[in-house]
Amino acid sequence: MKRTSWLWLVPTLALVSGCNTALDRARSTASVTVEPQAKSDLWGAVATAEDRDRINRLGLAWQEALTVAKPKHAKEINSEGLLLKPRSGLSRPEPTPGSYNCRMISVGKTEPKAPVFEKFKPFFCYVLTDDAGVLTIVKQTGSRRPAGRLWEDDDPNRLIFLGSLALGDEKEPLAYGEDPARDTAGIFERIAPFKWRLVIPWPRSGAKLELFELTPVADQPEG
């Protein structure tokens, strides 16, 4: 009886041993899956709540700006082609570093006395890159000179611009976030071969949209 009483334990021990082996094998082959961080989380952590809201309301800025400006300026708006058409961004929005011919157009207004459509004199701006591949844009001339960094976004057809303004004879713009009154946020897109635009929704100038067109200078400076 004693000898027989031990026999029923053999299959049980074998079963337990088999389960432990399977668990050990599962533990050894298990891998930890880490979800990649959303690109919008990176620039969103830097942008102020006000600028995140401006970017999120970009579609509304386009709609209201064009609705107000088209009755009197339809011909001028149409002549600008893709520059003044929403949702015109193409793939590969990253600009090539170098010097650019730039011009600005403001559309719509948030203040009664502001013009609903205005073109400004052309100027030069520059796209810079550092060793890490970070792209920045600097407006080189004028009394209001925005400068800032381009951030990757979840939307592969656009980059996010976060920058600030240099005023008057200031040599350097303030860092983004240093003076909220100068902070500037927008969307950077490629809209045609060798043509980009920077769209600033709800700027502090009294417009509803500010659009900067960028085309590379033909003769790039050496170096």
Where do the PLM segments sit?
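Short beta-strand segments that buttress and anchor functional surface loops
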Residues: 135-141, 161-164, 198-203
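An anionic, turn-rich surface loop/hairpin at beta-sheet edges
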Residues: 110-123, 162-186
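Bacterial N-terminal signal peptides that target proteins for export
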Residues: 1-8
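Mid-length scaffold segments of soluble, non-membrane domains
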Residues: 92-159
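Edge beta-strand at a domain terminus
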Residues: 78-82, 175-223
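C-terminal motif of bacterial Sec signal peptides marking the signal peptidase cleavage site
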Residues: 15-18
